[in-house]
Amino acid sequence: MMIENDTFILSKRGWLPLTLVAVFFLFFTMTTLHLFQFICGALLIALLLIYRNPERTTSINEPNAILSSVDGVVLSIEESLIDDKMMKKVTILNGLWDVSMLRAPFSGIVNGYKIRHGVSLPLYSPLSETLNEKAVLSFRSVCGDEILIEHMSDQSCFSIEIEAQTEQKMKEGCRYGFLAKGRTILYLPNSAVMSIHPGSNVRAGESVVAQFA
């Protein structure tokens, strides 16, 4: 089942808050309440940045490529034992001013996903792992390779949104959700050949993170 993709310049999920803030901005402009006009103007610009939804394409035409699902900076690359299987763990931090749209890492199928609704504590808090809002998705490529992706919010008033269904087919770079600020972890097969390193800047739907062996 294919879900209608959000391809507008500004994400549809941002239309309501943007409209409300724009109305208040115009009202305070007409009433010459300059302080409130400035506050609403700044908030309007911030929301435009957060909900921007650019088109992304990759020039890499390789069936084994794994693209980043999120914009941000690579924090670390390490090995981790998941369900008695050693996997590569790639941690990416995305800030509030990074593009918030989440994109499929390759063409394939969503094996499944789950969302834990919660709070949005700082990631350095020891309680964040158990209390913060989190989404975990499993993707399977057309060649049968599988990866896990975990998204967790970080000091954000915006909820994580996932627009996917189990067994849904997705094309490479297809939008599947929204994360305004947080941490994303990609769990890749241990045999995957990495194309990035800690400190690398990545762009969702464009940057190649690794290649399936």
Where are the predicted features?
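Contiguous, well-folded functional domains in the mature portion of proteins
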Residues: 1-213
